[in-house]
């Protein structure tokens, strides 16, 4: 663990263990970076457990290669640094030179090499007279030491390893190490950074759960966003790995790649929204979001080591602008940044909650939708997902212009998904818009596509015509006050441990709402209620909707207050990550549209322990 970010350096491991526990407590998992190919040139452990020998401690430095060594050496040759020693500092001395991390096997790495790192020796002699040779029997020293390191961190109750440059380490080691680690920690996840697509299957067989699909899907989608290749090319890249698609990790940003909104990519985070929708929704495999991507982080700072290169520095202590504003004072975010985050939140939530996305089958529609007046495969991409009786049609638009499109659904899709030919009512999960589709084999479904976005239409193929009939609402509520009611319910649940209100009258001029509490709130607690409400309103949390059936209600969501004749399809209203509740009423799009929350007064009934709040919102 990094002593620079410890509160108490001597107890930093205890701090790490407590951090892991806190992360697990809020329902998240911990994946740590494991760098198996190289270490820092000056590496040495300062806290080896008793009986453990450090990397290189027992090496024979007079041998360029030995399967018993942990490093490679240049016997009799000192290390020659490719950059000058800063004024006032002592020159770095290393004799004999260790070989450099990016497979540079002499003592004079260039400025473009990884000269600050040294290559670990896994039993491969890269400079054998007859070419590369392999020495895996007996098991090389580095294999056992690196496996012990994995086991040590696995014992800290983490959930997985992201393995840096995994393909620079022989797959035979990974088979050895993952078998041992997963034997003791069966749920441990291994994520590998592999760039050679021809090696994907080898590393999957070696125990990796997921592989970065950089050279495949990332490069493809990036080029589509930048208008360098057609959207229809997506088909080739998923088909190329169709047998291992569930092992592909999709992404549009990571620490090695340029930021989407940077001048080096496309200059605008919005342009990647259709690519994000495709990457997150077309398969059951994971999609990774890099911190700040959801706000459209520019990555255009000229940091000390890396300079202005469109990436967020990984070498310097630095303040990332959107993260500072987005996570510490949302009032400083621009409206465009808030809108972009809301889209990411919507799509990622449905990717994890809609069974058709996280469990369902996939059908690519591009082969029956060539260039036509109503469809342009250069900027449009369409596919279906299905689970049981739920079908979702996703159509995205990489263009800067709004388009009216017609999407052909072939007879084969009807046969594959066992879909009936009939009218269905569909709802757009992004906008809550409802429409009717006439489903026919080889028929066309028409829709309007906004620029740099898409439509996500969900419908049921049950033969009975229930589809998305929701119960009629018994009153026309004032949306700002109605959303405030949801927000207030969660505030009271968290502050007082009570149930959500069962008695509320929500109106435009003023509203009343009651809670059963174990004590009468003090004046300070009443003030805290109002303060918390206005704090949440100022955070401008997005208000989003999703549709689920009764058998797939998310954990923690109660539907016991719905009427007995409530429909099978339930609409959930989410307010950021703060609240989720079944509801069919009208709401604002984000909490800032509520306006100011004003607590008008309270009443306490000591006999029933009922606490009534009178409030109004001032948009």
Model-derived regions, located:
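Active-site-proximal helices and loops of the catalytic beta/alpha 8
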Residues: 38, 47-54, 62, 68-69, ...
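Short, acidic/polar
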Residues: 137-154, 272-276
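Hydrophobic faces of well-ordered beta-strands that scaffold small-molecule active sites
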Residues: 30-32, 161, 190-192, 250, ...
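Acidic/aromatic-lined carbohydrate-recognition and catalytic surfaces
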Residues: 1-121, 167-198
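Loop/helix patches that line or flank the sugar-binding groove of alpha-linked glycan CAZymes
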Residues: 253-254, 259-423
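C-terminal beta-strand-rich structural cap/linker in extracellular carbohydrate-active enzymes
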Residues: 437-463
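The substrate-binding groove and active-site-proximal loops of carbohydrate-active enzymes
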Residues: 1-13, 117-142, 158-168, 218-225, ...
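Active-/binding-site microenvironments in catalytic and ligand-binding cores
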Residues: 463-619
């Amino acid at each position: 663990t990094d002593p620079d970010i410890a509160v108490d350096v001597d107890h930093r491991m205890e701090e790490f263990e407590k951090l892991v526990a806190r992360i697990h407590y809020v329902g998240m998992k911990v994946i740590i970076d494991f760098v198996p190919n190289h270490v820092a040139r000056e590496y040495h452990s300062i806290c080896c457990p008793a009986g453990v020998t450090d990397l290189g401690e027992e090496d024979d430095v007079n041998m360029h290669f030995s399967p018993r060594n942990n490093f490679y050496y240049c016997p009799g040759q000192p290390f020659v640094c490719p950059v000058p020693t800063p004024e006032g500092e002592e020159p770095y001395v290393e004799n004999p030179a260790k070989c450099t991390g990016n497979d540079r096997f002499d003592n004079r790495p260039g400025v473009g090499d990884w000269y600050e790192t040294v290559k670990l020796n896994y039993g491969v002699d890269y400079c054998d007279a007859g070419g590369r040779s392999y020495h895996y029997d007996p098991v090389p020293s580095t294999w056992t030491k690196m496996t012990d390191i994995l086991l040590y961190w696995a014992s800290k109750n983490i959930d997985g390893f992201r393995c840096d440059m995994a393909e620079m380490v022989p797959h035979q080691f990974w088979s050895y190490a993952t078998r041992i680690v997963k034997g003791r920690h069966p749920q441990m996840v291994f994520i590998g950074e592999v760039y050679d697509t021809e090696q994907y299957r080898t590393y999957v067989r070696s125990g990796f759960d997921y592989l970065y699909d950089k050279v495949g899907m990332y490069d493809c989608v990036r080029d589509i966003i930048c208008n360098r290749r057609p959207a229809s090319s997506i088909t080739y890249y998923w088909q190329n790995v169709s047998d291992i698609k569930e092992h592909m990790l999709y992404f549009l940003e990571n620490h090695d790649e340029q930021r989407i909104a940077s001048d080096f990519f496309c200059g605008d985070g919005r342009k990647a929204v259709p690519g994000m929708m495709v990457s997150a929704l077309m398969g059951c495999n994971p999609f990774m979001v890099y911190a700040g991507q959801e706000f459209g982080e520019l990555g255009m700072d000229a940091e000390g080591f890396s300079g202005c290169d469109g990436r967020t520095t990984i070498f310097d202590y630095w303040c990332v602008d959107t993260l500072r504003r987005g996570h510490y004072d949302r009032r400083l975010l621009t409206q465009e940044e808030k809108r972009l985050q809301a889209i990411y939140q919507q799509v990622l939530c449905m990717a994890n909650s809609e069974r058709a996305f996280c469990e369902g089958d996939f059908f690519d529609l591009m082969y029956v939708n060539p260039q036509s007046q109503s469809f342009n495969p250069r900027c449009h991409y369409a596919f279906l997902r299905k689970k049981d009786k739920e079908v979702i049609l996703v159509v995205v638009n990489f263009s800067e212009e709004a388009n009216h499109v017609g999407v052909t659904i072939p007879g084969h899709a009807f046969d594959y998904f066992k879909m009936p030919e009939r009218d269905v009512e569909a709802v757009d999960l992004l906008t809550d818009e409802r429409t009717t589709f006439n489903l026919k084999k080889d028929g066309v479904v028409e829709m309007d596509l906004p620029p740099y976005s898409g439509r996500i239409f969900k419908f049921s193929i049950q033969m009975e015509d229930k589809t998305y009939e929701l119960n009629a609402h018994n009153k026309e509520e004032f949306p700002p006050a109605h959303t405030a009611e949801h927000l207030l319910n969660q505030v009271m649940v968290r502050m007082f441990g009570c149930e959500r209100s069962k008695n509320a009258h929500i109106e435009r001029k003023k509203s009343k709402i009651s809670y059963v509490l174990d004590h009468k709130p003090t004046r300070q607690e009443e003030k805290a209620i109002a303060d918390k409400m206005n704090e949440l309103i100022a955070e401008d949390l997005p208000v989003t909707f999703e549709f689920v059936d009764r058998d797939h209600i998310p954990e923690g969501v109660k539907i016991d207050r719905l009427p007995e004749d409530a429909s099978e399809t339930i609409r959930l209203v989410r307010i950021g990550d703060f609240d989720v509740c079944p509801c069919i009423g009208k709401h604002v799009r984000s909490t800032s549209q509520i306006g100011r929350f004003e607590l008008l007064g309270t009443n306490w009934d000591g006999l029933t322990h009922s606490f009534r709040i009178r409030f109004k919102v001032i948009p």
